[in-house]
């Protein structure tokens, strides 16, 4: 019986110590996604449209690209990761 009480006390002390610990072991960096990763370098025009924009973006290593005409993009080819 003494061994059971001792082991139960020991387990409870370990649980108490773990719950009072200030270490944040599961923390990790949060990396932004979405528009912040977009690249809008080229200007779109009547001769440089969505097709050429997407092709240039893919050749630059992005997954896709499209011409955006609304502010704040102001008719630019934006490449997406």
Swiss-Prot record:
Keyword list, A-Z: Antimicrobial, Disulfide bond, Fungicide, Plant defense, Secreted, Signal
InterPro entries, sorted: Defensin-like_dom
Keyword Ribonucleoprotein in annotation: no
Residues annotated as signal peptide: 1-27
Broad class of where this protein is predominantly found: secreted
BP-aspect Gene Ontology terms: defense response to fungus; killing of cells of another organism
Superkingdom in the source lineage: Eukaryota
Pfam families associated with the record: Defensin
One cellular component (GO) term of this entry: extracellular region
Compartments where located: Secreted
Disulphide-bridged cysteine pairs: 40-79, 44-67, 53-77, 57-78
Family statement drawn from the similarity comment of this UniProt entry: Belongs to the DEFL family.
Protein name: Defensin-like protein 45
Originating organism: Arabidopsis thaliana (Mouse-ear cress)
Classification of source organism: Eukaryota, Viridiplantae, Streptophyta, Embryophyta, Tracheophyta
């Amino acid at each position: 019986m003494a061994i059971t009480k001792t082991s139960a006390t020991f387990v409870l002390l370990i649980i108490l110590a773990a719950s009072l610990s200030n270490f944040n072991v599961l923390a990790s960096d949060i990396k932004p996604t979405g528009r912040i990763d977009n690249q809008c370098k080229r200007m779109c025009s009547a001769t440089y449209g969505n097709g050429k924009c997407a092709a240039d973006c893919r050749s630059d290593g992005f997954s896709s690209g499209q011409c955006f005409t609304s502010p704040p993009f102001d008719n630019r080819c934006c490449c997406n990761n």
